[in-house]
Every structure is written in C-alpha cells, then in structure tokens.
From Swiss-Prot:
Disordered: region residues: 118-159
Biased composition (Polar residues): 137-147
Origin: domain of life: Eukaryota
Entry keyword set: Ribonucleoprotein, Ribosomal protein
Protein name (database record): Large ribosomal subunit protein eL24
Disulfide links within the chain: none
CDD domains (alphabetical): Ribosomal_L24e_L24
InterPro entries attached to this UniProt entry: L24e/L24_sf, Ribosomal_eL24, Ribosomal_eL24-rel_N
GO annotation, cellular component aspect: cytosolic large ribosomal subunit
GO molecular function: mRNA binding; structural constituent of ribosome
Family: Belongs to the eukaryotic ribosomal protein eL24 family.
GO terms of biological process kind: cytoplasmic translation
Length: 159
C-alpha cells in the first residue's frame, strides 16, 4: 500500500483518496482534499493556514513542537584533526599561518617587482625587434585614394 503526502497540507493520503493535479510543465501534485486544492489554487501560503502540517511545525503545535525540541538538543561533535594537506607538511602550514602581515606584504611587493622586471625585459626585447624590422624594410609610397562619383542626394521624400 503506497501512502502519498499532500503537497499543500503535508498530511498522508491513502490509496483511493485525494486529487491529482498535473501542471503544464508535467509535474504531478497530489492534494488531500478539495480544500487543500483550493488553497493551493488561491496561492495561499500553507504556513499561514492553521490546519496544515507546515503551520503546526512553524508554530510548534502539538507533537510537531515536541519533535523540533528533541532535534535541537542533539548536536554532532566535530573532531579537529591536524594533518598535512595538499603536499604541505603540518609544520609548513603552521609556519604560514603564523606569518606576520609585514612579512607577507614584503613577499607580495618582492613578487610584484620581479614580475614587473620580467615584463620590462620582454617589452624591451620586442621594441628592439620592431626597430630592426622597421630599419630593414624600405619605405613604401602611400597610394592616393581615387575619387569615386556618388549619386546626387535625393531632395524631398519618396512621395
């Protein structure tokens, strides 16, 4: 025996009961009663309707309120494990974590300086290559543009 759940009220629906609504996107919604179906069609939020399960959970009514309280009490304890990660030893990780801001800033500046120097060297090499290219190529004469006759402008409109 397959017991469904109402998408609106949250109550169980036994075989032979309930109404099915097939939406245009192909999803099937099962409602406990016409009352639940009407509430859904009127776009009423089930959390605000007093007889739905969602309302009872939200406002901690009856057995639903007791379930929530017992759930909150149980918490899983998290174990902290110190170990090497991604090819770094534990000592290396701790050393990185304990670095001062000044040391990190100096490292950043040094890395930026090295990158800038490398860029300057590449630019200088390109500039030298361009100068050699220009010197080896003979200057070509510029071609003059031909005057192309265009149609006279149309005065007035189409009609």
């Amino acid at each position: 025996m397959k017991v469904e759940t109402c998408v609106y009220s949250g109550y169980k629906i036994h075989p032979g009961h309930g109404k099915r609504l097939v939406r245009t996107d192909g999803k099937v919604q099962i409602f406990l009663s016409g009352k639940a179906l009407k509430g859904a069609k009127l776009r009423r939020n089930p959390r605000d309707i007093r007889w739905t399960v969602l309302y009872r959970i939200k406002n901690k009514k009856g057995t639903h309120g007791q379930e929530q309280v017992t759930r909150k009490k149980t918490k899983k304890s998290v174990q902290v494990v110190n170990r090497a990660v991604a090819g770094l030893s534990l000592d290396a990780i701790l050393a990185k974590r304990n670095q001062t801001e000044d040391f990190r800033r100096q490292q950043r500046e040094q890395a930026a300086k090295i990158a800038k120097d490398a860029n300057k060297a590449v630019r200088a090499a390109k500039a030298a290559a361009n100068k050699e290219k220009k010197a080896s190529q003979p200057k070509t004469q510029q071609k003059t543009a031909k005057n192309v006759k265009t149609a006279a402008p149309r005065v007035g409109g189409k009609r």
